[in-house]
């Protein structure tokens, strides 16, 4: 029996070896299954069947087979994790890989793939770096393409920059490099990388003569879509829309690419071209896309669709899309859109409660700035229940919002320059107007505390921070304007100390230093007069602003060259070459032609004799103790008693109704005129005789002559 057993097993393995050499995966599955039926503990047969199921892409059958044999599954941990990865069970795949030895390069590479699909791009980047450093095979270019894809995803979705010093040769790697530059906001480098990727792709495709035009377009479709996205970023939406439409008409085999193009078309259309947008939304909502897109991409697509429904007043569809987003992840954009929808329905209280519930679930640095700022805006504008005011906010609301921001915002947001200026404005608003809830000194105390805490926060981070220098300047100017001279002087002293410590840029800081010293003198003058006088000595005073003759320039501006000649006053000779130029340019040239005192070869300026002071001539009716008429210095037409030049209107014909005179009966000529006899009844109805034709002609001729 033992010899028969050995013989049967040996022949079975021989058949299995032949099937493996021929890559007949169905035959491998049958033979290894027969071996495991008779000999359940055969590890080699078990491994062969698992690999054959993977090669045949029967991942569900493979995973169920592994679960039925938990004892032998410990020998194929990597294969089990790969099957779970292909079935999009990423969490289970990550747990399976934790029990595998981490030093194995293939395990590290699979871990990088799993982390990349889960959205942990930094972890995937670290694993891929290790694999590339330790591997020496023919797949280095593929790994470089994967590395650039990871760096591009990190820059696009997380706004983080990973060091990428690679020069991929494959067009896939060049395409990923273009996406990396796009994530960093550099459209120029992205366009250049896309050009390189397209040229490399065309060169590779030209080597295959059997390639059809459809297959060529399918390979170039991702590059064209990315180029259209750059056009869309540059506000060239019509050109981008044409590219998206052409890619969709070609019907690429990648559903994720079609979904991205359709989503971008919806963004371009907004609330226009509703029929086309509905078709694109349907294309971007096909089944299976959740496994081909990142979670950030899926969320953005759903929010864009909800925005389209919101613009077109389809509130039920908008709510359904937002509900789908909330089931996957809690997105701040989706939450803001839900609050906007409630405000549109005039449910302001529900919108406030929705935002407050989000803030209560998150604390610390996890809070996005959009949610608390939106809540602050609602509380600031809310006048009563479910009503938002449009005028100036109430001081009570301003004080409550300022205190709310201090309680809910994390440190890095509460001390940002924008939030600091907002808090200062709110405290000033709380102490202004008739309904002020606190006095101006109390508000200034709170403002000073805000400024001091913010400056202390940046001092701990490092005084070389640019934001710290910006805050010192602006806070000092504000405090000096509000009368807080002592604190303003302290801030100016700190800024001067920072400038003096920076020796490298001494020439650039000299002018800034003079400005700060001037501000410091203003601050000292309000509480320490001797110190202000001492600080004034460090200011660099100029002896003269210009070498030009100020009196000549003033008279030239006031009277002009012709008036000076007419009055007999001396004027500078004009150059004939400057006839066509303006008077201002001629004056500039005259100033530039004057030699400066610093030039050793310049001729000395001849001093002109001083003019005699004109004797004061007082008017004849001058009275020493009486205030003169203030209108005497105004032009004649601007004086209060000026009525203009009167005209003789006695012979001018009167036009229109001239009013009624009380004594009109005295001047009525009809009263004093004799009475006219009224004709009898028979003659009253008679008509005048008709004129003859000859009389009419004579009358017409007479009119012509009169003309």
Swiss-Prot record:
Major location category of this protein: cytoplasm
Annotated Polar residues bias: 684-695
GO molecular function: 7S RNA binding; ribosome binding
Residue ranges of the region described as Disordered: 564-707
Gene3D superfamilies xref list: Tetratricopeptide repeat domain
Cellular localisation: Cytoplasm; Endoplasmic reticulum
GO CC, alphabetical: endoplasmic reticulum; signal recognition particle, endoplasmic reticulum targeting
Top-level lineage group: Eukaryota
InterPro entries: Signal_recog_part_SRP72_RNA-bd, SRP72, SRP72_TPR-like, TPR-like_helical_dom_sf, TPR_rpt
Keywords for this protein: Cytoplasm, Endoplasmic reticulum, Ribonucleoprotein, Signal recognition particle
Biased composition range(s): Basic residues: 608-618, 638-649, 698-707
Subunit (UniProt): Component of a signal recognition particle (SRP) complex that consists of a 7SL RNA molecule of 300 nucleotides and six protein subunits: SRP72, SRP68, SRP54, SRP19, SRP14 and SRP9.
Function recorded in the entry: Component of the signal recognition particle (SRP) complex, a ribonucleoprotein complex that mediates the cotranslational targeting of secretory and membrane proteins to the endoplasmic reticulum (ER). The SRP complex interacts with the signal sequence in nascent secretory and membrane proteins and directs them to the membrane of the ER. The SRP complex targets the ribosome-nascent chain complex to the SRP receptor (SR), which is anchored in the ER, where SR compaction and GTPase rearrangement drive cotranslational protein translocation into the ER.
Recorded family membership: Belongs to the SRP72 family.
PANTHER family tied to this protein: SIGNAL RECOGNITION PARTICLE 72, SIGNAL RECOGNITION PARTICLE SUBUNIT SRP72
The protein's name: Signal recognition particle subunit SRP72
Organism whose genome encodes this protein: Schistosoma mansoni (Blood fluke)
